[in-house]
Amino acid sequence: MRGMLARWPETPHCSYTRDGASSLNLRGFLRLFTHIQLLPILESGEETTLVGGQAVMEGVMMRSPHSYCVAVRKSSGEIVTEEKPLAKLSDRHPAFKLPVLRGVGTLCQAMWLGMKALHFSANHLAEDLDGDKASKKEKKELSSWAMWANVGFSLAFFIFLYKFVPLYLATWFGHLVPAAGSRFGINMVDGLIRLVLFLGFLYLISRMKDIRRVFEYHGAEHKVVFNFESGQPVTVENAQQFVTWHPRCGTSFLLVVMVTAMAIYALLPFDSFTAKFIARIALLPVIIGVSYELIRFAAKRRQGLMAVLTQPGLWLQRITTQPPSNAQAEVAIHALNHAMELEKAQGGELVIA
């Protein structure tokens, strides 16, 4: 189902050029690649009675327990939407209700949904750029190719930058400084290097104009979710009163993942570089699942452990979220309203716990 709304027109937001197809494709490829790398960061968790969401290119995706909606503002000022029912992975496969496995299932579904939302927004931005020069079929095929190419490239980049490089440098440092050459020392250096690379990556991309706009939509998503959770009428004016950093943001989750990884890697009985590298890849689902359980456990103790686990993520969200404009907040509200309408149409009930 798709809908349109024209309000709060903005100046054109696409910074691509039309100087040639190769230039456009390369810029678009790099833009998609960066967005895919950011998917876990831009994701906000959804619980049984709450809503969650994610920023996409020039828009926001909002989801409720059984539905989701992507809203994107085109350069003309129109808001285009796509809303669909959403079945939880744990409802179809009960095994994903078990501890640890439920965290893996939740992240996999969130990434899959994030890719669909990103695909939708990328298609509409491509239409803005191409106009009527290409058929819809051609645009879809180009977008699908670019998306899948970016998924593969992003996965390889993730493994290389956050698994291979930190371990390689930590092993080299351990040979250079014998005191850091123990298993514990190498794992500590490995974790610190990984954290520095992550923070450096965030800082560098935050300087990009396109990504800064995504961070503004990320802030809009958080403000609107806060507005909804407060019980106040969800309006642009009410949403703008809230802060942009939210405790359920994927930024907080990723930091917990990094700390959990350091603890689990320290238990590995391997000494060879190859064995440690393979184990780091193989243990990714375990690390994700354990991190999810820690966040879930801490969420029930909001004044104690939850505050400790989420505070670094809240600080980091000063980078990954930025104050949105009223027009950007309106897009987030539009996505939320459509997701809620579909949720209620399916017999669901949205209440605040």
Predicted segments — roles?
Residues 152, 188, 192, 255, ...:
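Hydrophobic alpha-helical transmembrane segments
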Residues 41-52, 56, 60-62, 130-133, ...:
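Polar-ligand-bearing catalytic/cofactor-coordination segments
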Residues 128-177, 182-208:
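Hydrophobic alpha-helical segments characteristic of transmembrane helices
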Residues 120-121, 154-179, 257-279, 288, ...:
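Juxtamembrane "helix exit" motif at the C-terminal ends of alpha-helical transmembrane segments
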